[in-house]
Amino acid sequence: VKTFFKVTLPMSLSGVANGLLLVFISCLDNFGTVAFLGIPARITVLSTDIYQAIISFSGNSFGEAAAESVSLGVIGVLAALLRWQVAKMFQTMQTDLEDMSPRFFLRRKKLLVESLMWLVIFIINFVPMLTLIVTAFMKGIGGGYGLDNMTLENFAFVFSNAKSFNAIKNSIFLGITTALICVVLGTIVAYLMVRRPSVLIRVVEGIISVPYSIPGIILGLALILTWARPLPIINRTIYATVFMLLVSYVVRFTSLQIRNSTTGVLQTDVSMEEAAEICGASGFKKWSSVIIPLIFPATISGMGLVFLNALTELTTSSLLWSAGSETLGVVIYNYTSAGYTTYACALSTVVCITILALVLLYRGVSAILRHKMGRNG
């Protein structure tokens, strides 16, 4: 116990503090859970209060929402700065070697502790998901769980309804397009940060990181106020189109790609690039034959993370969607708000199965790539 408090805890304090602040920032940004559970019970937080102020279209709704957004944004930025400062403060106490060996030996109590942990995980994770899936097959929520109350009509409706189908199409388009744009922008910034560090590139990286640090509801309001008017020269606006959502997703999730691409570039020995230059390879040849293959696992990991975040995004989309640009999160929320809970559960089940399949596919591809790289190495 003394070793834990004197050695282990101080050395892991950076990770613990980072985790706490990350959870705090995530809770500030959480809109979906609070909107589903809080709004019907008249429990409001800043994010849902901003949302309700905007959709009310009252005399000064945007002014009130902007004022609350500034308050929420300040809290989010301060939390992000504190997280960065904590990581910097305890950086010297970290070790380079990862040690996964156990610190405590529970002996006969091990089975009891593991059983309690699995019970908690089952209650807070698996039970809600099982309830969601079962409800997706029910004719009505009040009809019980008997076979006479089970049907596939909810799924038939989801796949035949124009709004549901359009939401699936829009979310897939936004997810793929956002991932492709972010991988290009994020990898370029990551490469410059590692290989060509400068004050300018640090400022650029900081600016790109801000939209991910602040709650998405603030970003949505900022984009509405910025893009609501027609663009100069072309006299066109992207407001109330799917491209407005694309802009918000790229702005919000590029930071995720930068982190993963930075890891890939850091793991690549600069001597490989120097060897390509000595052999007379052009910039394009160096990137296509050396850099991209070496950082590919990290960049593809970032792309997958960006795609999944874009596929399930609701916070920013709740403000920016319009007729024809609905996303999966928006349609599920609208179904629930309108009382069509079984339809919402059916569409949610489809989304969960899709995400599970994509995660398994990603892990399979990653395992194959690691095997090939290990064999070639």
Predicted regions and their residues:
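Transmembrane alpha-helices
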Residues: 2-29, 115-129, 210, 214, ...
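Interhelical loop and adjacent transmembrane-helix boundary motif
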Residues: 39-75, 106-110, 140-143, 150-163, ...
